[in-house]
């Protein structure tokens, strides 16, 4: 299974530690990648980048600054790949 752990950081200089911890926990079980974007990236660019990599599952780390864009991305990802598994984590999920 090809898995993506991703997020939209608020700035280019930010790094998401949560997805790195998760990657370390599952790297022996699945083929896992990390891709980080920022809220300044165009959603079409992010969608294309994710779609072309052909992931089986995509998990987003969500926060107050990215939740609306991530929801839009999830809707569009499902339109182009209805079989992909999508999961959300982080403080905005609860």
Task: State where each predicted segment sits.
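A short, flexible N-terminal coil/short beta segment enriched in small residues
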Residues: 1-17
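Glycine-rich beta-alpha loop elements in corrinoid/cobalamin-binding modules
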Residues: 2, 18, 22-26, 31-94
């Amino acid at each position: 299974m090809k898995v993506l752990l991703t997020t939209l950081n608020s700035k280019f200089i930010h790094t998401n530690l949560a997805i790195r911890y998760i990657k370390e926990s599952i790297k022996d079980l699945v083929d896992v990648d990390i891709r980080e974007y920022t809220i300044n990236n165009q959603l079409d660019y992010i969608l294309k980048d994710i779609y072309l990599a052909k992931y089986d599952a995509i998990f987003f780390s969500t926060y107050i600054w990215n939740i609306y864009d991530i929801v839009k991305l999830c809707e569009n990802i499902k339109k182009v790949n209805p079989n992909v598994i999508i999961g959300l984590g982080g403080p905005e999920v609860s």
